Regions:
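Active-site-adjacent structural elements in enzyme catalytic cores
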Residues: 1-140
Length: 140
């Protein structure tokens, strides 16, 4: 979500179009709004993407030792020992991961697990938007 003011372009929330692409097309730098600033734009509620189950963002391997009955959402080629798991993209394709994110959250939320574990993706391109959604899902 972007907006404009007298100083230029403002990025309110990362989405499918990477920040760098907006800057390239417009030829202008894009300012990002601080997360603590209250903005009246769609999707800005802190828990906008929150499933019913608790979502924990961290190191999956470490967190699996703490949570016995956990569902796991992960990215890339990992050997995860969990009954309920969803790989956003085995090939680390951010576009594929973005397309799978809400299905993953929904399926893991509907599982018999007590908690959903996930890690943040690379902070580049669509990874920023995916991480934003994961962080919102983790807010309770």
């Amino acid at each position: 979500i972007v907006g404009f003011d007298s100083e230029g372009i403002i990025l309110y929330r990362h989405g499918a179009i990477p920040l760098e692409a907006i800057e390239e097309v417009t030829g202008k730098p894009v300012r990002q709004i601080a997360q603590h600033v209250q903005i009246d734009t769609p999707g800005q509620l802190k828990s906008h993407y929150a499933p019913m189950k608790k979502v924990v963002i961290g190191n999956i391997e470490n967190d699996l030792a703490r949570y016995v009955n956990a569902a796991v959402i992960f990215f890339g080629n990992k050997n995860i020992n969990a009954k309920n798991q969803f790989n956003l993209s085995a090939t680390k394709n951010l576009k594929e991961a973005a397309a799978n994110l809400f299905m993953a959250l929904r399926q893991m939320d509907e599982s018999n697990a007590e908690v959903i574990l996930c890690e943040l993706l690379p902070e580049e391109g669509l990874g920023r938007a995916i991480n934003d959604r994961l962080k919102r899902a983790a807010v309770k």
